[in-house]
Amino acid sequence: MAAVFLVTLYEYSPLFYIAVVFTCFIVTTGLVLGWFGWDVPVILRNSEETQFSTRAFKKQMRQVKNPFGLEITNSSAASLATGMALRTDCLEDSRLTCYWGCSVQKLYEALQKHAYCFRISTPQALEEALYSDYLHREQYFIKKHSKEEIYCQLPSDTEIEDFGPVPRSRYPLVALLTLADEDDREIYDIISMVSVIHIPDKTYKLPCRILYQYLILAQGQFYDLKQLFMSANNSPPPSNDESPEDRSVEQSLLEKVGLAGNDGDPVEESSRDCVVCQNGGVNWVLLPCRHACLCDSCVRYFKQCPMCRQFVQESFALCGQKEPDKDLLETS
């Protein structure tokens, strides 16, 4: 019996040693990958580890004041045949110029010209860059802080029923907001705003909405204005201890980054609660998913967005007063 056992052990010992070596190799590889920031199974991670070794880059941001605001007030009823209603909210006297059937190619060529050739600070400058490649033009004078509705509609004599199948060579409507007073252009970094608007027609019935918004800077840059996403859970209304000045500053900041509601009402306190601890106020935006969902304390613990699980490449703070330790934002 002993001889049979020894023979069996001798036959299977190489397989046993191979299995042990292979297991050690897998565990060592997992630990090394985890040390250098690669995502590894939870079972291979240190149970006492409280923070990830890889930190998202902190994106350097510069605060600028956007003097322009534009929204669609009748998106459900708007169409190419009946027109649409726009509401502006500008900090200074401005001009709203609407270009119907603007060439897609010419528009982006015009934006590139702003960066390399000349500045798009007036409607005339944009029209020269477009080579007047649009079907109809309307212009309105906007008084500062006026929220009057402006109704835009193609004239009936144009006899345009649609802009063709997708992909299209023309945008239904391009709205340009510019500062009316030349002196105001020296005050603001943002000198104009281009909004590309889709309007449903007989061929393409997607609901009316703003497709893109580009902020045109005096220095020659232009940026695509993106919306941020926040949680909308129900919670008690905001406390009355907050001063009106603090509320106005907070609301102004949210409007600049696109978080304010379309109706201009203050954002509820629920939308400012951290989705993890439900305690601190939301102050960090994660990129590229654009979820604003973490407070100053919780941002250091995540390399994946807690809302959509997408890996975080960069992040930035909405307010600069409170920041985590610098070493927590460094990438190994």
UniProtKB/Swiss-Prot annotation:
Q: Which residues form a coiled coil?
A: none
The UniProt GO MF terms for this protein read: zinc ion binding
Which keywords does this chain's UniProt record carry? Cell cycle, Endoplasmic reticulum, Growth arrest, Metal-binding, Nucleus, Zinc, Zinc-finger
Q: Does the keyword Nucleus apply?
A: yes
Under the heading CDD domains, the entry gives: mRING-HC-C3HC5_CGRF1
User: In its UniProt record, which GO terms are filed under biological process?
Assistant: regulation of cell cycle
Alphabetized InterPro entries for the sequence = CGRF1, Znf_RING, Znf_RING/FYVE/PHD
| A Pfam family the protein falls into | zf-C3HC4_3
Is Coiled coil tagged as a keyword? Answer: no
Q: Name one GO cellular component term.
A: nucleoplasm
- Cite the residue ranges of zinc fingers (RING-type): 274-309
Classify the main location.
Answer: nucleus
Query: Which cysteines link up through disulfide bonds?
Result: none
> What SMART domains has UniProt attached to this entry?
RING
Q: What SUPFAM superfamilies does its record include?
A: RING/U-box (SSF57850)
Protein name (record): Cell growth regulator with RING finger domain protein 1
